[in-house]
Amino acid sequence: MAGSTRILVWDGALRLFHWSAVLLVAAMWWTAENGVMDWHRRMGMILVGLLAFRIVWGLIGPQTARFGSWRIGPAAVLGYIRNLRSGVHKPSFGHNPMGTLSVIAILAALFMQVGTGLFAVDVDGLESGPLATLVSFEAGRQAAEIHEISFNILLALIGLHVAAIVAYLFFFKDNLVRPMVTGRRASEDFGNVSLSDAKLSWLRLAIAVAAAFAAMWGVSNAG
């Protein structure tokens, strides 16, 4: 769009979280499949920090990162679906209602992966999560089974997420990947929105990063 102003929708910290999580999930799958469990555990600890960061960032970050900006009420979701079925799509400043549900589901699956992985024990008791010593062998085995099931659920959710992105591009000519890379969209998509809405606060960023390191330190020292 020639001459348009491009507004910052996704701050750099949120984008870094997003793509780091993508890479970590792929790498952790590979390490688990190939038995590289030392690295699997290390990357799991990084994911602990990332999720702690996301929780704090969802409370104190810019508008589009905050949980309070998410529209997930039945009226918002059903109204959005009706518009899509009618062929009406207006880009949202942040997550649209369906995108919000997708993010919540994926984050929940990631938390389930991390939570069970920390306590999981393999069938021979040779490999285990960093907190496995805090629970019985039977509980560790149950955690391992849930860990595997929840990963399959996570893969299904990621598949649906990617399929939705492709559908938006195909049916509505709306590229949702580019803004998650550059952070910006044309301001004309949103109307009158303050350009400062998605900018970083370095103090708040420092607090969120500190929370991430605190979570990693706490987990690594709890076992």
Task: Give the ranges of each region predicted by the language model.
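Membrane-embedded alpha-helical bundles that constitute the cytochrome b-like, heme-associated redox core
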Residues: 1-223
